[in-house]
Amino acid sequence: IYEPDPEPGRATLTGEPSLGTRCGYRKRGSSSGGFSKYAMALESWNEFNEDVDIKPLGFSAEGDWILNSRFTFDQSLMRNPFLYALSNQIDRWAVKTQFIEIFHDATGGDITASDYFGVYTFMEKIEPDKGRLDIPSVNAWDNSEPDVTGGYVFKRDRSGVGEQSLNAAGSGGAVPLTSPNIISTPQRDYIQGYLAEMNSALNAPNGISSTGKHFSEYMDVGAWIDNFWLNILAMDPDWGRLSQYFYKERNGPVSAGPIWDYDRTMGSDDSRDDNPRQWDTGNPTWYASNYPWFGKLFGFKSNNQPTPAASSTRPDVMQQVVDRWFELRAAEFGQSNMETIINGMADEIREAQARSFARWRNPAPGSISGQNFSEAGTTGWERDVSHLKGWLKARSEWIDQQFFLPPTFNKNGGVVEEGFQLTMNSNDATVYYMTDGSDPRAPGGGTAIGAIPFDVGPIDEVLLAADSSCQYFVPLDASLQTTWFLPEFEDTDWFSGTSGLGFESLNGPLNSHITTNIKTTIMPSAT
């Protein structure tokens, strides 16, 4: 491995390499292994052909690596690295990547210019490790709790060479186990039993299995939602049924992820992802019988795509799905951030891509299979990069339009000047708000008690004089709940006092601000 010299920013093949190692490699990829420019799995070896850890290109020490190629479908050369970077930005671990150029002598002899193999992505494998997917490994002797509970890595995919499969209830198909490599009978019984209970909870109308546990105790719902949106943003034709990873931490729930394999997405040359302004890619988005866990979690038994938020039988989960989309759109999924990632990657390979495409032209860069979203006047590889950015813009804006847009404020919090009036844009929908910090949406999707409908204009704020009279009550249980919010609530039996109202000890620092001290009301024996 030759790394660029920091000063000129270039690597030269006449000096000493940054790292040299023996290694073994094999072609990889269930559908791409037969390409002329093939991907490779790499193992670093010592002189005895034993695995040895190396630290190349600033990565953590490990012995298993991937040289990921792009021969067709992704002419930008960056769809995988882009989405992995986006996933890491939202704190969902994905493999780290680095663009490289390869000389590959597959026949023996001296390395010459004819051995140039083009631009590749050097990347990690998905495996438990402190420098990678940071969950404990399951060892052969981990056959009782808590050690038997994790970590496991499995996927919905075709089975790979030497991989064992789990009998996972409700998965819709094969579930190869990628870690541990060899599983004991107690370990298999544990993880299959856990997944069966999870599926039972998903099938139950109330979300509770026969064990009394809710599906949210079996699944990291937030991780499943983030994995869903990464896949749906990319419009992955294979998501959920191929290259769909899951992992279970020790004493923890099942998470969806890490994400994997996105060369046939985001307006690639695959054609199934040409149109960013639709949900489905030939495979359903919201429910599919061959990958039903996501659909069941979101409250679907069929692919109710026209109005998914309204069709769900789990409106609270679907509200989390919608809220998370707009949260991501305001930050990492914003067009500016996505283009910053793409532009940075494009700068890295702008010179190298020309050499790579001179070696491999299948198809030639700039040949877009569907609708063109690139800027006018761009050509070749620059057109592919521009198309990727334009496609993502069209995709994310279309998804925005499938849900009620959240209200916007003339200021999103912080210090304001005296006299400031808060206004809110309700986007032609009825918006409710609360003034006590609670959610105006009740569980199940109704309007919470005390929620105030917003009328266009400033929100009035009522200020009370410092010495206003007040009434107060110290509850002994939760029977009041929120009934005291209601205008008709009867409070004549409450104590009377003068504000400020507070709780403070005899010589406490807030005594000068408190006129009615309720400490002895709450704690009769207090002084």
Q: Can you name each region flagged by the protein language model?
A:
Residues 523-527:
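Short beta-strands within extracellular/lumenal beta-sheet-rich domains
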Residues 455-509:
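Accessory carbohydrate-binding/adhesion or oligomerization-edge regions at the termini
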Residues 88-103, 236:
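Short, well-structured beta-strand/strand-turn elements
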Residues 42, 217-275:
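Active-site acidic catalytic loop and adjacent metal/ATP-binding pocket
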Residues 192, 199, 251-403:
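C-terminal catalytic region of ATP-dependent kinase domains
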Residues 1-82:
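Conserved NTP-binding catalytic cores of kinases and kinase-like/nucleotidyltransferase enzymes
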Residues 371-468:
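Short, compositionally stereotyped local motifs that mark structural "simplifiers"
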Residues 53-56, 69-70, 122-234, 285:
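ATP-dependent phospho-/nucleotidyl transfer catalytic cores
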